[in-house]
């Protein structure tokens, strides 16, 4: 498919947190940019890219819901601005993956409504344990996401990395920001949370299940 035809098709729709809406001018530029740099719908491994974009979109959506839950409980406390800053970065991540979903015609996971509820509940629930509980959740989730992004980087590097240069740049940038969030959590007493090791292990086990399901459903 030519860039012009891909652009014409993409202009008909846009994804915002799982809903299809008309594509904005910004989304159109994203589609053209990827076409012009060599990463088109024709010359990529569609199955691999579909899985990567779908699961990353779901992960960033879930992260947004977690931070929303934390802010609902701790937004007016001293840790509120710290959580808000991390949440703002996660909003940028989600926006980018919304655009990539449109540009590469990737459907969202069918589990979006489930992650909506579970993410908020996890964020609010751990925040009810106090600042330390919220930060423990942040450490567990961000560590899992960073590890997941590293796996994706290795996968794309094995599949003619020059074709996926821009996608690799996005994933690497977001991986680094997730690691920053991880370190912020540790700096704000995550390890002082009640039953920290158990809590972290349970959350990370849930993250593994979420990644597995979101790639496939």
From Swiss-Prot:
It catalyses: a 5-methoxy-2-methyl-3-(all-trans-polyprenyl)benzoquinone + NADH + O2 = a 3-demethylubiquinone + NAD(+) + H2O. Its cofactor is Fe cation. GO terms for biological process: determination of adult lifespan; regulation of gene expression; regulation of reactive oxygen species metabolic process; ubiquinone biosynthetic process. Keywords: Iron, Membrane, Metal-binding, Mitochondrion, Mitochondrion inner membrane, Monooxygenase, NAD, Oxidoreductase, Repeat, Transit peptide, Ubiquinone biosynthesis. Its EC number is 1.14.13.253. Fe cation 2 binds at residues 90, 142, 178, 181. Binds 2 iron ions per subunit. GO terms for cellular component: extrinsic component of mitochondrial inner membrane; mitochondrial inner membrane; nucleus; ubiquinone biosynthesis complex. NADH binds at residues 51, 208, 212, 216. GO terms for molecular function: 3-demethoxyubiquinol 3-hydroxylase activity; 3-demethoxyubiquinone 3-hydroxylase (NADH) activity; metal ion binding. Fe cation 1 binds at residues 60, 90, 93, 178. It is found in: Mitochondrion inner membrane. Belongs to the COQ7 family. Component of a multi-subunit COQ enzyme complex. Interacts with COQ8B and COQ6. Interacts with COQ9. Catalyzes the hydroxylation of the 5-methoxy-2-methyl-3-(all-trans-polyprenyl)benzoquinone at the C6 position and participates in the biosynthesis of ubiquinone. Catalyzes the reaction through a substrate-mediated reduction pathway, whereby NADH shuttles electrons to 5-methoxy-2-methyl-3-(all-trans-decaprenyl)benzoquinone, which then transfers the electrons to the two Fe(3+) centers. This is NADPH-dependent 3-demethoxyubiquinone 3-hydroxylase, mitochondrial.
């Amino acid at each position: 498919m030519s860039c012009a035809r891909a652009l014409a098709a993409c202009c008909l729709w846009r994804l915002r947190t799982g809903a299809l809406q008309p594509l904005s001018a910004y989304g159109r530029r994203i589609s053209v940019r990827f076409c012009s740099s060599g990463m088109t719908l024709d010359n990529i491994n569609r199955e691999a890219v579909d899985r990567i974009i779908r699961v990353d979109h779901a992960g960033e959506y879930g992260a947004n819901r977690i931070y929303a839950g934390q802010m609902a409980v701790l937004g007016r406390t001293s840790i509120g601005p710290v959580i808000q800053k991390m949440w703002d970065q996660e909003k940028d991540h989600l926006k980018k993956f919304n655009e990539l979903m449109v540009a590469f015609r990737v459907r969202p996971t069918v589990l979006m409504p489930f992650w909506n509820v579970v993410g908020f509940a996890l964020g609010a629930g751990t925040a009810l344990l106090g600042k330390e509980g919220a930060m423990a959740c942040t450490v567990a989730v961000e560590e899992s996401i960073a590890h997941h992004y590293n796996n994706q980087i290795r996968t794309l590097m094995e599949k003619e990395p020059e074709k996926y240069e821009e996608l690799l740049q996005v994933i690497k940038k977001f991986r680094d920001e997730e690691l920053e969030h991880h370190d912020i959590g540790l700096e704000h007493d995550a390890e002082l949370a009640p039953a920290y090791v158990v809590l972290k292990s349970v959350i990370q086990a849930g993250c593994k299940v979420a990644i597995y399901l979101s790639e496939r459903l």
